[in-house]
């Protein structure tokens, strides 16, 4: 973990160049598809979006990255519409076309996972628990569906997870509880609520922990800094990506995606 973190760190860009968000002539971009699966955790069908790489070949296996939204949001937030147009498809497509990122499949789930109600009804402990319950929906229902219906590689070396705000909190929680499944863990402006010793057992460390924060975040404020300090105090190697002018929204997300997809699946 420490060795790979040292390799990644000098390559991290504070922000993505404008060209990363543009569709370029001669470049083929991935296809966004909407799908759904039955969640035994929630006892209902749940939607997700999936980004398949250009020229997706069902006879070829691809690594997979799960990218999660924040509070009150849904599966469209990280790929279609955020504060403005999301350029996730272009950022990832350009990185792959430039040979800077592996061809990959990206999954954008709806992470609210209550067994008694479909959507978030407020910012309180009950709804927080529904978001935290996504670890069960993900590992018991969504991941098996993806592995059955799409041509993905399996194992922690081929599986990444990241998320924004509440999705960043869930990414940290899931990554720390299931290091056997996820080798690359990211978080963008993560919400508070992750507690514990902020350590993995020897031999269970992920290849990479990549945390992004925005200097102008007026929602979670210094919460990411607190996580950063805890990881540093406990000697956990990680990337600390502090976006100058980054707010709690699209520009911090784009900067993170630009860097994280370049670092994933290469350790």
Protein language model regions, located:
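Non-catalytic cap/lid and distal C-terminal segments of serine-dependent acyl enzymes
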Residues: 1-267
């Amino acid at each position: 973990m420490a060795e790979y973190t040292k390799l990644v760190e000098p390559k991290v860009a504070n922000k993505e160049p404008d060209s990363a968000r543009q569709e370029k002539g001669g470049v083929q971009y991935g296809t966004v598809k909407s799908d759904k699966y039955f969640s035994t955790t929630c006892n209902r069908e749940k939607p997700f979006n999936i980004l398949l790489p250009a020229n997706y070949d069902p006879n070829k296996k691809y690594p997979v990255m799960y990218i999660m939204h924040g509070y009150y949001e849904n599966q469209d937030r990280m790929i279609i519409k955020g504060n403005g147009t999301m350029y996730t498809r272009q950022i990832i497509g350009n990185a792959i076309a430039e040979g800077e990122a592996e061809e990959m499949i990206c999954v954008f789930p709806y992470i609210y996972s209550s067994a008694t109600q479909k959507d978030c009804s407020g910012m309180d402990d009950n709804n927080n628990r529904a978001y935290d319950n996504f670890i069960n929906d993900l590992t018991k229902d969504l991941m098996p569906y993806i592995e059955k219906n799409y041509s993905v590689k399996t194992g922690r070396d081929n599986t990444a997870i990241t998320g924004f705000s509440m999705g960043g909190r869930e990414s940290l929680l899931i990554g720390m509880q299931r290091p056997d499944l996820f080798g690359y863990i990211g978080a963008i402006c993560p919400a508070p609520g992750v507690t514990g010793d902020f350590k993995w057992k020897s031999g269970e460390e992920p290849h990479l922990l990549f945390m992004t924060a925005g200097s102008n975040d007026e929602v979670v404020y210094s919460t990411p800094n607190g996580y950063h300090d805890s990881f540093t105090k406990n000697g956990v190697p990680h990337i600390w990506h502090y976006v100058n002018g980054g707010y709690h929204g699209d520009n911090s997300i784009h900067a993170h995606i630009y860097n994280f997809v370049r670092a994933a699946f290469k350790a």
